Amino acid sequence: DMVMESDRSEFVIVYGRRRVGKTFLVDQYYQGSYDFTFVGGHNLSRQRQLTSFGKALKKFSGSKPDKFSDWFDAFDALEEYLELLDADRKKVVFIDEMPWIDTQKSDFVSALENFWNGWAARRSDIVFIASGSATSWMVDNLIENQGGLHARITSSIYVRPFTLHEVEEYLQRKHCKWDRYQILQCYMVMGGIPFYLSLIDPRQSLVQNVDRLFFSHGGIMRGEFDELYNALFSNAELYISVVKALAQHHDGMTRTEISKVIGANGGTLTRVLTNLERCDFISRSQNFGCKTKDTIYRLMDFYTL
C-alpha cells in the first residue's frame, strides 16, 4: 500500500529462487490489474524478446505493434503508451523473469537505466516492478548496480521458501491428514518450495506422492533438477558438479577441496560459489580464528539434497 500511495515513482524488485512464488505474490496483490506486463522468455534471442515485448504492448495499448530495433526503442514506446493514461493514478508496470531478457549484448540494462532515470523517476505516478529467479543477476544488475541504476531501487522483496511450520500450515489448508513425521519428511524432500507443495495430492501418502511426482513416467518433478539449474545459471553443468560434490560431504568442503573435485578455480569458482550462496543452495561458515581459505561450504537446499 505504501508503494501505491507514495508521492514518487517506485522501483520495486521481487527476487528469490525459481518456483518460490514471486509471480504469484505480485499477481495476488495487484489482482492482475497491470497497465503493462511482460514476461521474459528463456533462451530467446534479443529480437524475439523484442517482438514479444511489442505484442504485449499491443495487447495493452490496442495499437499496432512496432518493430523495435533495440531496447531503447521498446522503452520509448512504453513511455508513449503510459503517458496516454490517466495522470491522476499510479500506473503499474510488471516485468517478470527480467534476467532472461538481458541476453548477450542486448543493451537491455542500459535502456532500463535510461527509461527509469530519464523518464519514470522524474514523475510521481509509476510503479515499476521487476522480478526474476536468477538472484545473482538481480543483485548485480539492480540491487548492487554501480552504474545508472545505483541506489535507484526504492523497495525490494526477497521471497524465501516456506519454513517447516509454514509447510505444516499449508498442508493443513490442503486438508492433508499426514502426521508430523510425514510433514517433516515432505519438507526434507520438497524444501518448502510452494510450487512443489502445490503438486501434492492430499488423498495419497507421502510415499505415493513422491513416487508419482518423481519416479513415474511423465512425473512432473522427474526432470526438475536439470531444468532448475539450467534456468538459473549459464554453464549449469559446473554448478551441478559443485552441488553434487557437496552432497557427498555432509560436513562440508573447503574451496580447495571443491576445486580439486570439479577442476575449476580462480574467478570461475568464486562466481559459482557466490551465485549458489545467493540462491540459498549453499551456505558458508568459518570457524573462529581460521583463515578465509578454510571457509566451509555446505549444501543447504533440501530439494537438491
How does the language model describe each region?
Residues 154-182:
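Conserved small helical "lid"/interfacial subdomain of P-loop NTPases
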Residues 195-196, 200-305:
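Accessory nucleic acid-recognition modules appended to NTPase machines
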Residues 1-7:
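Pre-Walker A adenine-sensing motif
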Residues 7-12, 34:
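Pre-Walker A (Motif I) flank of P-loop NTPase domains
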Residues 22:
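Conserved lysine of the Walker
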Residues 25:
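Hydrophobic positions on the alpha1 helix immediately C-terminal to the Walker A/P-loop
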Residues 12-15, 19, 100-104, 108, ...:
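Sensor-1/coupling segment of RecA-like P-loop NTPase cores
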Residues 32-66, 79-80:
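Conserved NTP-binding/hydrolysis module of P-loop NTPases
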